[in-house]
């Protein structure tokens, strides 16, 4: 199940900035209809990596800009894990 942060994205914002309709984006992504575009935009589904990279190309912005809440959440978790790993390494070498 997705958290509220994971559902937040900027897909509609960047689609509109580019002046595209959902139908145009679906076509650029090689999809037959707009249903998955709508699901992605409203946070009902996360695009697979290949689709996320295609969106990055279509909208001309990094994937992190398209999904900023998810990016920040993941970055925070990784930084915490890095800090813990560094602390464990320092403690192990001091003993």
What are these regions (language model features)?
Residues 19-39:
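Short alpha-helical DNA-recognition segment
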Residues 57, 64-95:
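Short, charged recognition helix plus adjacent turn
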Residues 15, 26-27, 56:
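The alpha-helix within a helix-turn-helix
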Residues 38-39, 50, 68:
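Base-recognition residues in the alpha-helical recognition helix of bacterial helix-turn-helix
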Residues 12, 23, 49, 53:
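Residues within the helices of the helix-turn-helix
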Residues 43-57:
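Short, basic-rich loop-to-helix N-cap that marks the start of a DNA-contacting helix
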Residues 1-17, 91-94:
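A short, Lys/Arg-rich alpha-helix, primarily the initiator
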Residues 16, 30, 42-44, 71:
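Residue-level detection of the helix-turn-helix DNA-binding "recognition helix"
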């Amino acid at each position: 199940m997705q958290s509220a942060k994971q559902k937040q994205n900027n897909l509609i914002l960047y689609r509109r900035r580019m002046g595209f309709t959902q139908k145009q984006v679906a076509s650029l992504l090689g999809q037959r209809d707009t249903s998955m575009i709508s699901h992605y935009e409203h946070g009902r589904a996360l695009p697979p990596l290949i689709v996320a990279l295609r969106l990055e190309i279509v909208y001309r912005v990094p994937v992190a800009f398209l999904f900023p809440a998810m990016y920040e959440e993941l970055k925070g978790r990784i930084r915490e894990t890095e800090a813990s790993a560094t602390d464990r390494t320092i403690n192990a070498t001091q003993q």
